[in-house]
Amino acid sequence: MPRIPLEDNFTDVIGKAQRGLKLSDANLAEKAGLSRTDLAAIQGGEIRELALLAVARPLGLERNALLALARREWYPEQPLFKRSFAMFNTAFEDMTVNSYLVWDTKTRLAAAFDTGTSAQGMLDTLAGENLTLRYIFLTHTHDDHIADLDRLAETKAEIWNSELEPLGRLGAKTFQENAHFHLGELSIKTLFTWGHSPGQTTFYITGLSWPLAIVGDSLFASSMGGSATNYDMQLKNNRQKIMKLPLDTVLACGHGPLTTIKQERKHNPFFAHHA
């Protein structure tokens, strides 16, 4: 798979934090001690380092991580799975979206996480690996994540998503937080990390080469999903339920590349200072 670019740049991170905190440009400029000209410049993508450092504090962002993102100094080291894990990256408008497949090597039972805009790669992997799809888990129900659900549902796999964001589809089932599912030696636990959407769910999986958290749009490498209405809860859920997972946990995000807890604790402007 070609290298997947980071989902967000530094202007996206600044914008998400500003909208989440409901700060007007005038408020933010005053809190940061910046002129409106300097603020407009960095919002427009100009790298003014002193202005970036100044704006980080009122936005609750870690200044060094924000500056490194602006300088494009970091890209997450990609973890390798020896087996039983596949990532699919499909186009959606002017961006891409990820979906995932895990399976147990003995029983050949598999679980899918979202569909992206095309489930063809996932279906090809199921056939090529001689797998039976047992579960289709949804991180949330935004269109880009479930666009090909009808086709994947033809496998007759069980469809599951959060009780906080019911799909409204005949036969779909809902889970509560801390629900447990099993595929042979694989264990899957649900964590409610809502904020980006009402039922945004993280799936924590053990039994693979590394602990794995499929986080949907809860967070991305160097960023997180946007939330203009539940920003505080999204930060709280991410900090308490995702960022406290073991350091070697691989984060499989809804957009952008894979990353790890260890890397995000150092490089994500939203979370680095809470490590």
Residue ranges with predicted function:
Residues E77-G128, F203-G216, S222:
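Conserved beta-strand hairpin/beta-sheet module of binuclear metal-dependent hydrolase folds
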Residues L101, H180-L208:
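Core dinuclear metal-dependent hydrolase active-site scaffold
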Residues L61-Y75:
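Short C-terminal boundary/hinge segments that cap the last helix of small helical domains
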Residues G20-D38:
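Short alpha-helical DNA-recognition segment
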Residues I47, S118-S187, P211:
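Active-site HxH/HxHxD metal-binding segment of metal-dependent hydrolases
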Residues M1-L21:
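A short, Lys/Arg-rich alpha-helix, primarily the initiator
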Residues P198-A275:
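Metallo-beta-lactamase
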Residues L50-A65:
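DNA major-groove recognition helix of helix-turn-helix/homeodomain DNA-binding modules
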